[in-house]
Amino acid sequence: MEEFQGYFELDRXRQHDFLYPLLFREYIYALAHDHGLNRSILFKNAGYDKKSSSIVVKRLITRMYQQNPLIFSANDSIQNPFFGHNKNLYSQIISEGFAVIVEIPFSLRLVSSLERKEIAKSHNLRSIHSIFPFLEDKFSHLDYVSDVLIPYHIHLEILVQTLRYWVKDASSLHLLRFFLHEYWNSLITPKKHIILFSKGNPRLFLFLYNSHICEYESIFLFLRNQSSHLRSTSSGIFFERIYFYVKIEHFAKVFFDNDFQCILWFFKDPFMHYVRYQGKSILASKDTPLLMNKWKYYLVTLWQYHFYAWFQPGRIDINQLCKYSLDFLGYRSSVRLNSSVVRSQMLENSFLINNAMKKFETIVPIIPLIGSLSKANFCNTLGHPISKPTRADSSDSDIIDRFLRICRNLSHYHSGSSKKKSLYRVKYILRLSCVKTLARKHKRTVRTFFKRLGSEFLEXFLTEEEVVLSLIFPRTYSTSRRLYRGQIWYLDITSINDLVNYE
């Protein structure tokens, strides 16, 4: 963000009014290129030319406002390499610059909010692992849970209207609306709906989707605060809105009866918790199924009448936490009852006390993980390691380093597992697959290669956690081993490995 501030040097209070002129500045596309925003789509293939980028954008916007936006002269294709490519490339040029521009007000507002609330180490909140300590702390005291699939068929006009509450630049919004209608078929699908979580989606459309989800969660947060004894304060930094409460009151008057406020305060729910991940959300509560059905009704009404998205009530299931497992973010999470029997003796009488305590457990689902390893040609569908085809010019050290990197990344991500047995099996598959790959390259047997590599090869597959803990506790080996076998959550994990993403 310091780089953004250095480039633009605009007053924060007026920054959202000057977005459209930035679209024709050279440094916008330099930022998009230098920060790696989809560089493989545009700049790596077509080449980046600072002197001609703004000229290209001006011509594209001019032709987009005309009847035939893709009529280019022969001189254009000769003078500029951009015009020698297809329509997708032209739309990518504008979307790249527009994505950088519209993110500026959001980013600066978030930074100022974090500074005002004096929240240190806010980057830790972005870690995927930061969700699980929250679940460990809260879910062991809850009873019911709903795993909700957030509707993703969103009309493009609703996306523009949602962004209008954040960006007050009419020219930028008009250009965005025209751009979406013009290039929608070439960028997404022939239908006017977004297909989410696809690697081919531009950054701009992911930004529009996230702003739409922010709109939904803002309303959901308002409803939650109105119906709860406990007011939520920690989420305020993520849901700053302009004219937010005015819109909420209008929403309540139109789609609910006059007793809406009374209904909210009648059903007090102090233990409603919400978690969102990968286009899904989790609702958990300590109260009865009646209150869970209340929130189910709220969500269905919210999506159908406010966002015009068809949402079937049957897609929201209400389950008991003690009988249900949640599969998300590469883990299988559940709440289990752990019984402990204590024998007590008082004078001549002795009796047994059976204590049942709830514990939140997270394990590695081995079957989906083996399926991912099978698709990546590390093993077959039964989990038996196989040799992986490699390039002829790959050295042995490169092959070993590649397998070690994959093994350590998986171990690092799954360090929070309650049980390590599945993780040990994954290590075994990767280790033996590495040996078979080397043996196949040198046309030797696996046994011969094991003897050649020796015990040092097995030690190389020690995870980063084991090495670090052994350095911290050099004289207490049992302590480091016990800590490693426990759950460790890291706050530096911001992305999911492709082998872990089963969705």
From Swiss-Prot:
Where, subcellularly, is it found?
Answer: Plastid, Chloroplast
The UniProt record lists the keyword Chloroplast: yes
GO terms (BP aspect) = mRNA processing; RNA splicing; tRNA processing
Q: Which keywords does the record carry? A: Chloroplast, mRNA processing, Plastid, RNA-binding, tRNA processing
Q: Which residues cross the membrane?
A: none
Q: Name one GO molecular function term.
A: RNA binding
Checking InterPro entries in the record gives: Domain_X, Maturase_MatK, Maturase_MatK_N
Enumerate the Pfam families for this protein: Intron_maturas2, MatK_N
The question of whether Metal-binding is a record keyword is answered with no
Q: Which domain of life is it from?
A: Eukaryota
GO cellular component entries: chloroplast
What the protein does comes down to: Usually encoded in the trnK tRNA gene intron. Probably assists in splicing its own and other chloroplast group II introns.
Protein family (similarity comment): Belongs to the intron maturase 2 family. MatK subfamily.
Write down what this protein is called.
Answer: Maturase K
Species this chain originates from: Syzygium australe (Brush cherry)
Gene that this polypeptide is encoded by: matK
